[in-house]
Every structure is written in structure tokens, then in C-alpha cells.
Amino acid sequence: MHTLDTVDASSLRTDIPDFRPGDTLKVHVRVVEGNRSRVQVFQGVVIRRQGSGVRETFTVRKVSFGVGVERTFPVHTPVIEKIEVVTRGHVRRAKLYYLRDLRGKAAKIREKRENRETTEA
């Protein structure tokens, strides 16, 4: 079993920022079309993060032209160029599936306020 752990540890990424459900992310995804490769940005709210280690995934939801779009990404996949945290959200749940039923302002997530002591120190 230790050999599996070492293989898993070698394929983990270290450039992933700390993010939680409720945070708004910009996920830069490498898309291959034929022989060309380009980077596509997917910005939305993290509605879940599950698993651990190499198998850890997160789901990002956005509303595009009135249609809700959700994409699930493995955290440690090489397809992701980078992840940017746009805003930190203040939520009380680990899985935000209830956002699927909300529209407009009701689907808005409160922004987390930073403590002054931690930012000044």
C-alpha cells in the first residue's frame, strides 16, 4: 500500500490555492482543438469539494445566458493551468446544491470579511 501512496504523492500539485465552497474562482483550463491548444477561463462559485489526495474534485457553477452550467474538475489535473480565487464567500454548508434552485439576487453569496489582525500581522 505504501507504493500507491508514493505514486499519489508524486502526482499531487503544489500550486493550488486554498479555496472552499462559496468562493468564486477563475479556473484557467487548457482546451485542445485539433492541433491547437488554448486556455479557457471558467469563472463561477464552488458548490462542492470532495475526496482527498489525487482523487479530490471540485465543482464550479456559473449562470451563462440564463442557463446554469456546472463543471467538475479534478484538483490535481494537468489540464488546469491555474486557479485564481476572486472572492471568498461566507456560507454555512459544505455542499451548496441549494444554489441550483435559486435565481437572481437570491443566489448571491455573502462575501467573507477579513480580520484586521490577520491582515496587518
Swiss-Prot record:
Pfam families with a match to the protein in the record: Ribosomal_L19
Entry GO MF terms: structural constituent of ribosome
Gene3D superfamilies: 2.30.30.790
Keywords recorded for this protein, A-Z: Ribonucleoprotein, Ribosomal protein
PANTHER family: LARGE RIBOSOMAL SUBUNIT PROTEIN BL19M (PTHR15680:SF9), RIBOSOMAL PROTEIN L19 (PTHR15680)
Superkingdom: Bacteria
KW Thylakoid (keyword) present: no
UniProt name for this protein: Large ribosomal subunit protein bL19
Record GO cellular component, one term: cytosolic large ribosomal subunit
Family: Belongs to the bacterial ribosomal protein bL19 family.
Keyword Ribonucleoprotein annotated: yes
Classification via PROSITE patterns: RIBOSOMAL_L19 (PS01015)
GO biological process per UniProt: translation
Protein role: This protein is located at the 30S-50S ribosomal subunit interface and may play a role in the structure and function of the aminoacyl-tRNA binding site.
InterPro entries referenced in this protein's UniProt entry, alphabetically: Ribosomal_bL19, Ribosomal_bL19_CS, Ribosomal_bL19_sf, Translation_prot_SH3-like_sf
